[in-house]
Regions:
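Helix-loop-helix
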Residues: 1-213
Length: 213
C-alpha cells in the first residue's frame, strides 16, 4: 500500500516540477507526462500488440475450418471443443494468450497510477479555453470520445461485424465518464488515446509490409 502511494506521489511530484519549475503549466505538463509514461511502455505495448495482431490474423485464416467444426458437431459441445483445441494446436495457437495477459497486467499499475495521480494532482488552473482543469469540460469530453473512437478504429485485424460496436461503445462510455471527471483526466485520456492510435497505425504499416495485414 505504501509503495502504491509512493508511486502516485512520485508522479504528482514530477507533474508539479513540469508545471511549475519548468514553466509548462498544468495542462501541458499532463500531456508531456502522459506521453513520457506511454513512450516508456512502448517495448512492452508494441510486443503485446504485435503478438495479438499475429494471433488475430491466424484466427481469421482458421475461421472457415472453425465454422465447419461448429456445423459438424453442433449437438456435441465436447467434441466441438476437442476439435477446436486440436486445430489450434496444429497451428501453434492456445485458447488463451498467457503472455499477452501477463503483459497487460504488468502495465496496469503504471497506467492506473498515472490516472490516479492526475485525478487528485491537477489543481484549479487554466489551459487553452479551459478555465479550471479540476472541473469537467464538455468540449474535452467530445474530444475524448473522438480520440477513443480513433484509437479503436486504428486497431489492426478488426472484423467488420464487430467494428461498429468496438468503436462506438468505448467512445460513448468515455464521453459520459469525461463529463464527470476533471478536465485534467480528460486531457490524459485524449493524449493516451492519440498515442495508442499512432502506435496502432504504425503496427498496421509494419504488418502490411510483413504481409500479415
Amino acid at each position: 500500500m505504501h509503495l502504491w502511494q509512493d508511486w502516485i506521489g512520485l508522479l504528482q511530484d514530477i507533474l508539479h516540477v513540469m508545471a511549475v519549475n519548468w514553466g509548462l503549466g498544468t495542462g501541458l505538463a499532463v500531456i508531456v507526462l502522459t506521453t513520457g509514461v506511454r513512450a516508456s511502455l512502448i517495448p512492452l505495448t508494441w510486443s503485446l500488440a504485435y503478438r495479438a495482431a499475429l494471433r488475430q490474423a491466424k484466427l481469421a485464416k482458421l475461421a472457415p475450418a472453425l465454422k465447419l467444426i461448429r456445423e459438424q458437431h453442433a449437438t456435441d459441445r465436447h467434441a466441438q471443443m476437442q476439435k477446436t483445441l486440436e486445430l489450434h494446436r496444429q497451428h501453434g495457437l492456445s485458447m488463451a494468450d498467457g503472455k499477452g495477459l501477463l503483459g497487460a497486467l504488468l502495465q496496469m499499475p503504471v497506467i492506473y497510477g498515472l490516472y490516479k495521480a492526475l485525478s487528485s494532482g491537477v489543481g484549479a488552473t487554466a489551459f487553452l479555453w479551459i478555465r479550471n482543469l479540476a472541473r469537467p469540460d464538455r468540449i474535452l469530453a467530445v474530444l475524448a470520445a473522438i480520440s477513443t473512437a480513433a484509437a479503436m478504429a486504428a486497431a489492426p485485424h478488426m472484423s467488420e461485424q464487430a467494428r461498429l460496436m468496438i468503436i462506438l461503445v468505448p467512445a460513448i462510455l468515455c464521453f459520459v465518464a469525461a463529463l464527470h471527471f476533471s478536465s485534467g483526466v480528460a486531457l490524459y485520456w485524449i493524449t493516451t488515446n492519440l498515442f495508442s492510435a499512432a502506435q496502432a497505425l504504425a503496427l498496421r504499416h509494419t504488418l502490411r509490409r510483413a504481409g500479415t495485414a
